[in-house]
């Protein structure tokens, strides 16, 4: 008998016919549950049947999450593309924007798991003074299955750099061309609200006997996309008057700077809104909660990734 340890897990992404090894922290999670429909069995003539009966015919969307440290070599650039880019689709001459779909493979000490037709529903970039730059990913897929043991052959994996150089960065923020000082930390979140279309039919439900022939989700629509974040700043005599500030039309630029002062990653939110709030702590500070109101392509607003 052998056990599977999280620290030994390897994660791969398959997109466009190519597979990529993605180096993650141990913050990997994936699962899928089945939906239960209960029904009463108590009748007028038999009041003793107090416990409900049940039917299980369909699965809920699979859930996954993982954290990727970003490196100078940018071998994880496929992840950045999947976060930002949308694909235009057309149905009955109506054009819609869909998220890029991909497969995830996770190899453990005893198994190889696959999550099919994945989409990213959330990405969180969080950075502060000279900390390693990471992005936290979460999303959903249609089906989770075990496709083999630890020796399962995934085929050709895209080549990767011989080295992995972690990035220690610090945040730099400008609001309407004014540089913000005394910054503690910055976070930027990209959220995709996904609604899975109904997929249960009476005919298919009658054929379900176990998980192998259960009904799984297959199609979705993106109902809303949100780009937002928070800037945390020490309160000083230079910015004390801004603790209750707000704006509905500002140009916000968030940059992740390397130790040598060059920019590794940057996003421009223009126009955007923000509200300021004060935090009472050992050292007084204030936070700016911001959100993009710009509907242009997100990929064009990430102005630097190099």
Regions found by a protein language model. Give the residues of each.
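Signature of extracytoplasmic/envelope-associated structural regions
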Residues: 1-306
């Amino acid at each position: 008998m052998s056990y599977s340890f999280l620290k030994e897990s390897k994660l791969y992404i398959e997109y466009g016919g190519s597979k990529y090894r993605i180096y993650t922290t141990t913050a990997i999670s994936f699962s899928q549950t089945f939906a239960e429909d209960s029904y009463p069995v108590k009748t007028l003539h038999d009041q003793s049947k107090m416990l409900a009966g049940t039917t299980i015919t369909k699965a809920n969307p699979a859930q996954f999450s993982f954290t990727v440290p970003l490196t100078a070599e940018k071998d994880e650039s496929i992840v950045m593309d999947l976060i930002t880019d949308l694909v235009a689709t057309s149905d009955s001459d109506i054009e819609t924007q869909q998220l890029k779909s991909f497969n995830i493979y996770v190899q453990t000490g005893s198994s190889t798991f696959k999550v099919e037709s994945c989409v990213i529903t959330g990405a969180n970039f969080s950075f502060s003074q000279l900390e390693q730059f990471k992005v936290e990913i979460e999303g959903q897929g249609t089906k989770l299955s075990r496709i083999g043991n630890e020796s399962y052959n995934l085929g050709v994996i895209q080549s990767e750099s011989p080295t992995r150089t972690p990035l220690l960065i610090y945040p730099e923020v400008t609001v309407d061309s004014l540089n913000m000082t005394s910054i503690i930390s910055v976070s930027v979140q990209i959220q995709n609200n996904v609604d899975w279309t109904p997929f249960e039919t009476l005919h298919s439900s009658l054929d379900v006997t176990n998980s192998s022939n259960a009904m799984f989700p297959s199609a979705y629509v993106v109902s809303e996309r949100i780009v937002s974040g928070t800037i945390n700043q020490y309160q000083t005599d230079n910015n004390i008057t801004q603790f209750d500030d707000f704006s509905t039309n500002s140009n916000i630029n968030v940059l992740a700077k390397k130790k040598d002062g060059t920019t590794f990653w940057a996003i421009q939110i223009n126009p955007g809104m923000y509200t300021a709030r004060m935090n009472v702590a050992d050292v007084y500070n204030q936070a700016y909660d911001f959100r993009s109101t710009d509907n242009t392509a997100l990929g064009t607003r990430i102005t630097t990734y190099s």
